Design a protein with these regions (language model features):
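Short glycine-aspartate micro-motif
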Residues: 6-10, 64-68, 97, 115-119, ...
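Glycine-rich beta-strand-to-loop/alpha-helix junction loops that act as flexible
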Residues: 68-75, 120-122, 248-258
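ATP-binding/phosphotransfer module of carbohydrate and carboxylate kinases, centering on a glycine-rich
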Residues: 1-58, 64, 86, 108-114, ...
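Short, active-site-adjacent cap segments at secondary-structure transitions
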Residues: 75-77, 104-106, 125-126, 257-260
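Conserved phosphate-binding catalytic cores of ATP/NTP-utilizing and phosphoryl-transfer enzymes
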Residues: 1-2, 94-117, 134
Length: 319
């Protein structure tokens, strides 16, 4: 009897991550590809990213009992049928489900059990799942209307301060960090980058770690920006807890969750309301869990094995 295989894909705005596991939660393959938010890079590039991840994992040509793709940018105005069709073109499976990539994080946070999960990556949102499996979402308005507490928002807040430094109205290290990071040599270059050239949100959000670095070193403006964004996530999580009947626990995923300084501010913001917990599974393994559950309810040993692998990959910096 051939081994049952399950594939989960975290098709994010910055990169695509893919994991293949067997029915017992053992890892068979792991791969990465480029950005996969079709709203930012288009459907053709999105498909290329899926193929890149499949090839990187060495799983092209395999048949899967169940597959799940969490697409960044999948929402009310997205071509769901077309995204599903592309998924079938890339993956050999009779059982494919797709949804927004936030569900990868939500089901990974506590293995699909009650709790709140905050996503703090290029974008941001807060989600909750109750004992009945009902999902509630706050935030997630995108980079134009919201994304408070995200890498993109921290980067843009810092860039605006940097321009004030350029004008001489504020004192901060952020101007020099911005000029160096983006390779600007003049004010004309700054304007050209943001108003004329085409740059992705993830490229801009990549500046956020330098803002946090400046905050840790004592830069007042950088500290204010990071603290304010962390508190926005904390405030939204507390509002969620008061709105929905869920367990009083919060897991945080995304690039900013790796910053001790950011997490310290967030922990302070939810103190007395929510217990800050380590996610059971990183989002890509949350996607695998969804694929497995769509075929057959995952047993406890398999879930524990998935969690072990997820933890190993996180500790080794392989995610």
């Amino acid at each position: 009897m051939e081994r049952e295989l399950f594939i989960g894909i975290d098709a994010g705005g910055s990169e695509t991550k893919l994991a293949v596991c067997d029915g017992r939660g053992n890892l068979v393959g792991y791969g990465k590809g480029g950005p996969a938010n079709h709203l930012s890079v288009g459907l053709e590039r999105m498909k290329e990213s899926l193929v890149e991840a499949m090839n990187d994992a060495g799983c092209s040509g395999l048949h899967f009992e169940s597959a799940y793709i969490g697409y960044s940018g999948l929402g009310i105005w997205s071509p769901s049928e077309l995204l599903e069709k592309i998924g079938h073109e890339v993956i050999d499976t009779d059982r494919l489900a797709i949804n927004n990539d936030c569900y990868n994080a939500l089901y990974g946070g506590f293995g699909g059990e009650s709790g709140i999960v905050a996503v703090t990556g290029t974008g941001s949102m807060v989600l909750a799942i109750d004992d009945d499996g009902e999902v509630t979402r706050l935030g997630g308005w995108g980079h134009i209307l919201g994304d408070w507490g995200s890498g993109f928002r921290i980067a843009m807040d810092a860039i605006q301060v940097a321009l004030k430094v350029h004008d001489g109205t504020v004192d901060s290290l952020l101007h020099d960090k911005m000029m160096s990071f983006f390779g600007f040599d003049s004010s004309r270059a700054i304007v050209r980058y943001f108003y004329i050239e085409q740059h992705s949100k993830s490229e801009i959000a990549a500046f956020a770690p330098l803002v946090i670095e400046a905050a840790v070193s004592g830069d007042r403006e950088a500290r204010r920006i990071v603290e304010a964004n962390a508190i926005e996530i904390a405030r939204t999580a507390v509002v969620m807890y008061n709105k929905v009947a869920v367990a009083p626990r919060l897991a945080v995923v995304g690039g900013l969750s790796k910053s001790e300084f950011f997490m310290e501010q967030l922990r302070w913001g939810v103190s007395g309301w929510l217990k800050l917990c380590k996610p059971l599974l990183q989002p890509v393994f949350g996607a695998v869990l969804i694929a497995m559950n769509n075929f057959r309810k995952v047993d406890k040993p398999s879930l524990e094995r998935l969690s072990e692998i997820s933890g190993e990959y996180e500790r080794e910096g392989r995610l």
